[in-house]
């Protein structure tokens, strides 16, 4: 019998790959009448964090650097975060704590264990994060985006379904995208990607003669220069919309013929959900997580191609885009993504948690 859940605390922070799933879980739990509190770092000004969401900033730090001053500073931040998280959890009194990876969740997870609150985790990537691996020995269960990663954890692990961000098939954004062919969506990730913002526009303007009705929806990231990227498209006479962040990303993906993107877990999940072929350019850091994600997308999902950042050139990108926009290739990749999607779990994270309690 499923246990009644009244309150849930979410340990969040870091990049969009950790934050977006947490917000999705928050929305799903709120619809069930469950009170949700977000605890973490770096969300105060995050564009995804809407008004009315209960959030408390928790200091965090990872003392794994050689500089002794930084070690001391980060250790103090971690201790401060742990004490504040203990206080917030005592006041909120949740029935469980859910961690979404990244070291920003560390103080909250430690505080949750100290209060003996049941712990759950969510892993977005195909390579398990270190925090999730560490805490899996204490967790009641962990939900994952992709089933191959379940073997890496010491607790019950299962692929779960997370509701996607809101979208509308009749939205103005969707209509704008579908009025042009081809529509290409460029996503640099939640932190932006300078090399994508530089190389991709230069490559796409070279294709304007082949695709005169091409429309590009380019999300540069919150720290990037929108006007600089837009100038390249305008100079090349490419119809475009350049934005730092896109709240209606699913609308754009559903209307797109191709997406050019980093290979973070969240965008990979949304590309798969929208069944849109992709050219993935994985971020070379983050312990190689994105390259593993991209290889899975190419080799298992057969949904597109991968270009390593060190191999990225305008010429190569033009070749890959031309290949991807071929109607036969595009249809084949869409069908592959659709076939894989039909095999995926439909069990919600909420249902999985209730089974494990």
UniProtKB/Swiss-Prot annotation:
GO terms for molecular function: UDP-N-acetyl-D-glucosamine:N-acetylmuramoyl-L-alanyl-D-glutamyl-meso-2,6-diaminopimelyl-D-alanyl-D-alanine-diphosphoundecaprenol 4-beta-N-acetylglucosaminlytransferase activity; undecaprenyldiphospho-muramoylpentapeptide beta-N-acetylglucosaminyltransferase activity. Belongs to the glycosyltransferase 28 family. MurG subfamily. It comes from the Bacteria. Pathway: Cell wall biogenesis; peptidoglycan biosynthesis. Keywords: Cell cycle, Cell division, Cell inner membrane, Cell membrane, Cell shape, Cell wall biogenesis/degradation, Glycosyltransferase, Membrane, Peptidoglycan synthesis, Transferase. InterPro entries: GlcNAc_MurG, Glyco_trans_28_C, GlycoTrans_28_N. The gene is murG. It catalyses: di-trans,octa-cis-undecaprenyl diphospho-N-acetyl-alpha-D-muramoyl-L-alanyl-D-glutamyl-meso-2,6-diaminopimeloyl-D-alanyl-D-alanine + UDP-N-acetyl-alpha-D-glucosamine = di-trans,octa-cis-undecaprenyl diphospho-[N-acetyl-alpha-D-glucosaminyl-(1->4)]-N-acetyl-alpha-D-muramoyl-L-alanyl-D-glutamyl-meso-2,6-diaminopimeloyl-D-alanyl-D-alanine + UDP + H(+). One of its GO terms (biological process) is carbohydrate metabolic process. It is found in: Cell inner membrane. Its EC number is 2.4.1.227. The lineage of its organism: Bacteria, Pseudomonadati, Chlamydiota, Chlamydiia, Chlamydiales. This is UDP-N-acetylglucosamine--N-acetylmuramyl-(pentapeptide) pyrophosphoryl-undecaprenol N-acetylglucosamine transferase. The keyword Glycosyltransferase applies. GO terms for cellular component: plasma membrane. It is a peripheral membrane protein. Cell wall formation. Catalyzes the transfer of a GlcNAc subunit on undecaprenyl-pyrophosphoryl-MurNAc-pentapeptide (lipid intermediate I) to form undecaprenyl-pyrophosphoryl-MurNAc-(pentapeptide)GlcNAc (lipid intermediate II). It is an enzyme of class 2 (transferase). Pfam families: Glyco_tran_28_C, Glyco_transf_28.
């Amino acid at each position: 019998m499923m246990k009644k859940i009244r309150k849930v605390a979410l340990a969040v922070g870091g990049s969009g790959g950790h934050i977006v799933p947490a917000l999705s879980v928050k929305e799903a739990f709120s619809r069930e009448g469950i009170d949700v509190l977000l605890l973490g770092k770096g969300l105060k000004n995050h564009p995804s964090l809407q008004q009315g969401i209960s959030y408390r900033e928790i200091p965090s730090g990872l003392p794994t650097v050689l500089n002794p001053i930084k070690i001391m500073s980060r250790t103090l931040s971690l201790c401060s975060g742990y004490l504040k998280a203990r206080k917030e959890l005592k006041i909120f009194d949740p029935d469980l704590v859910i961690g979404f990876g990244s070291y920003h969740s560390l103080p909250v997870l430690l505080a949750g264990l100290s209060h003996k609150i049941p712990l759950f985790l969510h892993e977005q990537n195909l390579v398990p994060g270190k925090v999730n691996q560490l805490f899996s020995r204490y967790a009641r269960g962990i939900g994952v985006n992709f089933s191959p990663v379940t073997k890496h954890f010491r607790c019950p692990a299962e692929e779960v379904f997370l509701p996607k961000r809101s979208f509308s098939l009749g939205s103005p954004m969707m209509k704008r995208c579908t009025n042009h062919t081809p529509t290409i969506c460029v996503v640099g990730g939640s932190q932006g990607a300078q090399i994508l913002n530089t190389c991709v526009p230069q490559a796409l303007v070279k294709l304007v003669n082949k695709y005169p009705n091409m429309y590009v929806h380019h999300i540069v990231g919150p720290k990037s220069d929108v006007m600089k990227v837009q100038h390249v498209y305008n100079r090349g006479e490419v119809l475009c919309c350049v934005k730092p962040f896109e709240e209606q990303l699913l609308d754009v993906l559903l209307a797109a013929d191709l997406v050019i993107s980093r290979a973070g877990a969240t965008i990979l999940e949304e590309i798969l959900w929208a069944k849109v072929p992709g050219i993935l350019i994985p971020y070379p850091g983050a312990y190689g997580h994105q390259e593993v994600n991209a290889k899975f997308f190419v080799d298992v999902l057969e949904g597109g191609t991968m270009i390593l950042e060190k191999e990225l050139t305008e010429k190569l990108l033009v070749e890959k885009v031309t290949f991807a926009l071929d109607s036969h290739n595009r249809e084949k990749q869409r069908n592959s993504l659709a076939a894989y999607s039909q095999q995926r779990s439909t069990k919600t994270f909420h249902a999985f948690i209730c089974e494990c309690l």
